[in-house]
Amino acid sequence: VRRRERYDAIRDILTRRDWDALEKLPATGGQILRALMLFVQDNGALVRWRAVEALGVKAKALFPEDRAVREVIRSFIWTMCDESGNLCRMAPEAIGEILAMRPDLRPEFAHLLPQYMVEEPFESGAMWALCRLAEAGHAADPDSLRGLEACFGHKEPRRAGLSRRLARLAGLKPSRAGYPPVSFEDYDPSTGTLKMAT
């Protein structure tokens, strides 16, 4: 399958959210993962989120010894460096989803995510990734969450909401009550749609 045909096929798969078709695609795991990386920067929010989900689905389906997953994670980490010249704003979410589906890779990569909670423009994405990992049974080191409450009242609703969600998942209680309610757009993996979350 030519690269353009593969790209078009994956876009169709993401549109339909057809993970069986993703598995049957005539391409190597690395080729599919690299193509999905492109869709994480798509103009459409729903396509981006489904690409994130698909990265986890495909990573889980590959054999543990397949180096393609590690290479893609390292590529996402590189896209969070200014030197890359191609910042991928949803790189933390992609890494978090892959690690949620691949517990064997968490010791190698999960500890890298907390540092991005204070790194523009990845703060909210890093929080989402840590929430995803916590929901998958991998809690962040409490020391890495110090200062999280400073985001509870952040003017950006997503950052405020995700910081509160992460604190709840980590069992951290706010030092005071009275933070105003927030709502923000989030991806619902149970339905494959975007919805308002709190």
What are these regions (language model features)?
Residues 53-57, 92-97, 128-132, 165-169:
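Residue-level signature of alpha-solenoid helical repeat scaffolds
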Residues 41-43, 80-86, 119:
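Solvent-exposed loop and edge beta-strand segments that line ligand/cofactor-binding
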Residues 18-21, 51, 91, 126-129, ...:
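Conserved hydrophobic register position within alpha-solenoid helical repeats
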Residues 1-64, 167-171, 182-198:
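N-terminal alpha-helical scaffold/docking segments in eukaryotic complex subunits
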Residues 2-5, 26-40, 61-77, 103-116, ...:
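Amphipathic alpha-helical scaffolding segments comprising HEAT/armadillo-like alpha-solenoid repeats
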Residues 84-94:
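Ordered, amphipathic secondary-structure segments that act as subunit-interaction surfaces
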Residues 121-122, 156-163, 174-190:
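Boundary/linker segments of alpha-helical solenoid repeat arrays
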